[in-house]
């Protein structure tokens, strides 16, 4: 593979990762399809995917840095307010409660979960995750009990964490599981989305560091330019995607995302079967 070709592949996959990581459409499903079509598979490809996820995580940190520091008691002047945010009553305990279920299951069944990374499992997860999005829109309370992040209860945070366990199924979508769970628990669509992004930082960081540690032997000096391009591309695209997504969900439901998931599932079937 030539240097220019590998850098082009890195940029393409960085765009795919950045666009899909925080949308309820399954970044895993997209990365499997695009990686297969580009002929970029194997141990190096898996390590590459782990590295560029860090770029997506950094985008969330940049977007929500004030809120993230506020969770640990560090405040920088007067907080900037956005719709869905308020005065700092969301605490680190909410985040920890949202993490516990998936962390426990993820650590206990890490190797088993990794063995599920294949097209057939991803295809089914795309469909089931789409059905959950539709269920969340249809069954959510007419008036949310938590319209903003700071209205959320500990119980709601923990239940969202339980829904997050569904994302251990490759292709399900972590954001899809947590946002759907939040809506079913009476959290507004906007607040559930923001909580999902905040929850992503420790969850994805922990999972990525663990995967990177286990994949370190596949990383060589020659891969650094390619990995750097993918990382930066994923960061920039994820930043744009998050901002756009938070504006979009003020106007539309998640039904279009569910339909899109079904289309991607069909694409997985066509490409691999």
Swiss-Prot record:
Pfam families: BacA. InterPro entries: UppP. The keyword Cytoplasm does not apply. One of its GO terms (biological process) is regulation of cell shape. GO terms for cellular component: plasma membrane. GO terms for molecular function: undecaprenyl-diphosphatase activity. It catalyses: di-trans,octa-cis-undecaprenyl diphosphate + H2O = di-trans,octa-cis-undecaprenyl phosphate + phosphate + H(+). Keywords: Antibiotic resistance, Cell inner membrane, Cell membrane, Cell shape, Cell wall biogenesis/degradation, Hydrolase, Membrane, Peptidoglycan synthesis, Transmembrane, Transmembrane helix. The keyword tRNA-binding does not apply. It is found in: Cell inner membrane. It is a multi-pass membrane protein. Its EC number is 3.6.1.27. It is an enzyme of class 3 (hydrolase). The chain crosses the membrane at residues 6-26, 45-65, 90-110, 116-136, 190-210, 222-242, 252-272. Catalyzes the dephosphorylation of undecaprenyl diphosphate (UPP). Confers resistance to bacitracin. Bacitracin is thought to be involved in the inhibition of peptidoglycan synthesis by sequestering undecaprenyl diphosphate, thereby reducing the pool of lipid carrier available. Belongs to the UppP family. This is Undecaprenyl-diphosphatase.
